[in-house]
Amino acid sequence: MQNHKNELQRSMKSRHLFMIALGGVIGTGLFLGSGFTISQAGPLGAIAAYIIGGFLMYLVMLCLGELAVAMPVAGSFQAYATKFLGQSTGFMIGWLYWFSWANTVGLELTSAGILMQRWLPSVPIWIWCLVFGIVIFLINALSVRSFAEMEFWFSSIKVAAIILFIVIGGAAVFGLIDFKGGQETPFLSNFMTDRGLFPNGVLAVMFTLVMVNFSFQGTELVGIAAGESESPEKTLPKSIRNVIWRTLFFFVLAMFVLVAILPYKTAGVIESPFVAVLDQIGIPFSADIMNFVILTAILSVANSGLYAASRMMWSLSSNQMGPSFLTRLTKKGVPMNALLITLGISGCSLLTSVMAAETVYLWCISISGMVTVVAWMSICASQFFFRRRFLAEGGNVNDLEFRTPLYPLVPILGFCLYGCVLISLIFIPDQRIGLYCGVPIIIFCYAYYHLSIKKRINHETIEKKQTEAQ
């Protein structure tokens, strides 16, 4: 059962890499979380929030591109933080990110259970969570190739569905398709509310950015998958550039259709706004079909999240920052122990299905969103120090296969803007839980590293691995 070389296998192709990155984004944050963003920021504010969030994501991906092409390792930005920001920071970033995805996997499973209530309301949500949890475990447990192939088709389905939703919804907005019950065509009337363009004020747009960041969580998966991809120096640049623009295209156009049809006061997180929109249009069975597509999308993100978390846990442990038994691989190169423990911890997030579903769901998203912001800040900082060291050691920028443009402006701007997003959590009562939980965890990680990990770690071994990755 064990892979004696203890190495991950490079068996992902270019198409897998691109669809994993794109597919990792399109899930709960868009299909369910967008309802919260609309209700808080208003119609125009929701679109603005996704454009701003997309711009921030663009800055981070430009930084990640340079790092991932120069050092294509499974630990991705955790390895970069360890090398360029310090081992204690790398330890904190890695375990925080692992926790975020473990939490997200549980959220996705809960969301899948919520969607199943449309068809089988008598079956408890936790039953569906268990069933779907077993499914994604089996997909991940077979091999990295089986995971990549399944994720490719998962992602293809939801990308096709988003395009179809935009076409059908756009036609309804402009009167080309009639609404159910003879409702009037809204055109752009829903953009102007009884309280103006921004019903809750301009600041409300900024306050929704944590939720929006949660929606964009997953674009960084391309960096983690680079450690198991063929010819990353060729496939990564193309995948990163494509995923940036296509993600923005899908998110912004989908949000336009949602806010044009759905009054902002009716949006929430218990029912998908996508399903609500298709119900209003009244196309036979379209809402059920969309419900199935959203279910597929959510399981896709859970699948990708389990992959990302297990690889991060394996990377941490292989660098002596976690228990050694987590480094064991199967013959197919799957970190089985890390996979099992991650799925087990994800079960804690199933609390969202049995207690105060809407409140706990938003709390979990806030925590994951906060972790995403911290991780992305570390990517910007790592790229800044990587380029500076690269030049100091006599490197030529033209030798880099992927270059972050406008250095050092891009990493500095990305770091500072995400810092502002973190500070904004202080002013949002519903999302302060992200700080209340996140800050103590960060402090604990640093303290645990210095008190326990630092004295037993072999720094030369870690440095050797990082040097070999370059």
From Swiss-Prot:
It is a multi-pass membrane protein. One of its GO terms (biological process) is amino acid transmembrane transport. It comes from the Bacteria. InterPro entries: AA-permease/SLC12A_dom, Amino_acid_permease_CS. PROSITE patterns: AMINO_ACID_PERMEASE_1 (PS00218). It is found in: Cell membrane. The chain crosses the membrane at residues 18-38, 44-64, 90-110, 119-139, 159-179, 196-216, 243-263, 281-301, 338-358, 360-380, 409-429, 433-453. One of its GO terms (cellular component) is plasma membrane. Belongs to the amino acid-polyamine-organocation (APC) superfamily. Putative transport protein involved in arginine degradative pathway. Probably transports arginine or ornithine. This is Amino-acid permease RocC. It comes from Bacillus subtilis (strain 168).
